[in-house]
Amino acid sequence: MSNKDELYTFGIGENFHLQNYLGVHSENESFCFRVWAPNAENVQVIGDFTDWRNRPLQMNKNQAGVWEANSLDAREGDLYKYLVTRKGGQVVEKIDPMAVYMERRPGTASVIKVLRNKKWEDGLWMGRRKRLGFQKRPINIYEVHAGSWKKDDFGHPMTFSQLKDYLIPYLVEMNYTHVEFMPLMAHPLDMSWGYQLMGYFAFEHTYGTPEEFQDFVEACHKNNIGVLVDWVPGHFIQNDDALAYFDGTATYEYQNHDRAHNYRWGALNFDLGKNQVQSFLISSALFWIEHYHIDGIRVDAVSNMLYLDYDEGPWEANQFGDNRNLEGYYFLRKLNKVIKERHPNVMMIAEESTASTPITKDLESGGLGFDFKWNMGWMNDILRFYEEDPLYRQYDFNLVTFSFMYIFNENFVLAFSHDEVVHGKKSMMHKMWGDRYNQFAGLRNLYAYQMCHPGKKLLFMGSEFGQFLEWKYNDQLEWENLNDDMNQKMQRYTKQLNQFYKDHKCLWRIDDSFDGIEIIDADNKSETVLSFIRKDDKGDLLLCVFNMTPVERPNFTIGVPQAGIYEEVLNTEMEEFGGVWKNHNPVTKTQVATWKDYDHTLSFTLPALGASVWRIKRRLRK
C-alpha cells in the first residue's frame, strides 16, 4: 500500500500489517522511523546514532498523528527510543510500540533490527495443516514457560536455540502433538509469567532472537509438533516508558480513567473500540502467525475484555444498562474474522471463565468465532473432586458428571494449566488425596479421565512426571524428581497415555457432539464408578470405566451396547506405571443379560482408584 493508504486503513481500523508502515524500516542507505503519537507536542528519535540526547533527530508530524524521520547514521543493532514532549512540556523516553526486538534488561531501549525473510522448510507440515485442519485431529498440548522449563549450565533461561535441542526431543519422546508457550512477547521482568507486555511485535530478548524462534518452530513442524503462543490483547503494562499514555493522553488505553485502569492486575486496558488500537492489535496477531508460522493463539483473559464489571474497580453500565463491554465483543469478533479469512487452519483459543457469551459459536450465529475455549468449570469441579477424601466422593459425584450437561455447548480444551499449580494451590500430584502411593494412583486416574473425556487436552510442564512442589517461575522444573522410581513411572505412564490418545480415533475424532460419546452409567454414586463409551465415525468404540475410590471391585459388571470379545487396552494400575497389577484383565466375552437399557454385560475386575479402558477385539452377533 502507499503511505496514504496505510494511514487511511490505520485510521479506520483496517490496517492489519501495520508493522510494514510504522516502526523502523531500512530505506536505501537510511533508516526511516515512524511512530503514532497524535497529541504529542513534539517527538524526536534518540539512540546510539544520535549520542542519545546530545543530537536528537527531529521528527515531522503528518495529519494522521504519525511522526516520521530518516537517519543516515543509524545502523542495524543500534539502540533507540522516542523522546516525546507531552502537552505541558513534560518530556519522556518511550519504546517503539512496533519494535521487533528490545534491549537486554535492565535496559529498556528498542533495537533496530531488520527481520530476515526466512526460506521455510516446513512445507509438509503446513500442507498437512491446510488439508486436515484440526477439529477432527488429536490435540494434546504441553504448556511451557520458556524461562523455567530447564536452565542452562550457568543457571540462565535457555534460548530457543538451546530449547530446540532439548525441548523438541522431549516433546517427541512424550508423544505430545502441540506445545503452547506462555507469552514470548517483550515484557519488563526476567522473573515473571510474561502476561504484562510492553512489546507486541518484539520477541522477548531473554529467549534469544527472532531467528532462533523461527528455527525452533520449523524444527517442531519437521517433528510433527504444532506451536501455540499466548497473546494478551486486553491489557498492557503501565510502565511510563512503554505504551502507557504514550503521547500524554489516552493513546492506547480508554479515555475514561476507571475503564483504562485494570485494578486487578495493576495494568492498563486497551481501548478496544478505537480504530487505531484495533489495527495495532490485529496486526500483532497476524505478525506472529505469519512471521513465525505459529499454529495457534491462545487469547488471555477474555472475560476481562467482555465484561465491564470483571475487574475489581468501579464500573459503569453500557448504553443498554448492562455489564457487557460492547467494544470488546465486537473487537474479538473482528479479530477472529480477519484471522480466519487469511488463516482458516490457525487455532484461536480463548481463556474465558463465564458461560453467558457463546465463545466458539460461529460469527453468523452471534458467537465470537473462537475455535476452542478452556473448560474452566470442568477443571475446577474435577480438581475439587480428586482432592476430596474418597469416603465422601459419593456425595459429590455430580462434580464429575455435571460436565455432561454442557459438554457440547462450546468446543472445549480440558486444561490443567499453570494457573492451577501456583499461589498455594499445590502441584497436580500434591492436590491428590492420600499417601504418596494413592496420590500417584489418583493422578493416573485423573489424567486417564481427561484423555477419555470429550475435548482437546492441555497439561502444564512438570505435571507429566508428578512434580511435588508448585511451579516456580524463577527456577527450573524439579527434574531431580526423576531420580525417584515413582516419578519415573509417572512420566512413563504419561508418555504411554499420550500415545494411547493419538492411536485411538475414538478419543478425538468426534469431540463436538454426542455422536462421539455414550454414557453407560453416571449414577453409580455408591461405588463412585463412572462409565461411558467413546466412538469414532467408523463404528469403533472404547469402553471407559473409572473407579474413583481405593476399593478394588472384583467381578464388576456393566452393560455394553455391542456383544463381543473385549480386550483391556489401558489399566492405570499396572506395575510399570507405579501400580500393583502385573497383568491386564484377561480377554473377556460379553454375556447375554439385561442391564439397564442394554442386552449384554461385561464383567471384570476394576482396579482400586484405577481406570480401565476396553476395546472390542471381535464382534459377535447379538
Swiss-Prot record:
GO molecular function, one term: hydrolase activity, hydrolyzing O-glycosyl compounds
Subunit details: Monomer.
Residues annotated as the enzyme's active site: 300 (nucleophile), 351 (proton donor)
NCBIfam families: branching_enzym, PRK05402.1, PRK12313.1
Domain of life: Bacteria
Broad class of enzyme this protein falls into: transferase
Protein family: Belongs to the glycosyl hydrolase 13 family. GlgB subfamily.
Record keyword Nucleus present: no
InterPro entries, per database record: A-amylase/branching_C (IPR006048), Branching_enzy (IPR037439), GlgB (IPR006407), GlgB_N_E_set_prok (IPR044143), Glyco_hydro_13_cat_dom (IPR006047), Glyco_hydro_13_N (IPR004193), Glyco_hydro_b (IPR013780), Glycoside_hydrolase_SF (IPR017853)
GO terms for biological process, alphabetical: glycogen biosynthetic process
Organism annotation: Streptococcus agalactiae serotype III (strain NEM316)
Function according to Swiss-Prot or TrEMBL: Catalyzes the formation of the alpha-1,6-glucosidic linkages in glycogen by scission of a 1,4-alpha-linked oligosaccharide from growing alpha-1,4-glucan chains and the subsequent attachment of the oligosaccharide to the alpha-1,6 position.
Pathway: Glycan biosynthesis; glycogen biosynthesis
Official protein name in the record: 1,4-alpha-glucan branching enzyme GlgB
E.C. numbers: 2.4.1.18
Catalytic activity: Transfers a segment of a (1->4)-alpha-D-glucan chain to a primary hydroxy group in a similar glucan chain
Any one GO CC term of the record: cytosol
Matches recorded under Pfam families: Alpha-amylase, Alpha-amylase_C, CBM_48
UniProt keywords, alphabetically: Carbohydrate metabolism, Glycogen biosynthesis, Glycogen metabolism, Glycosyltransferase, Transferase
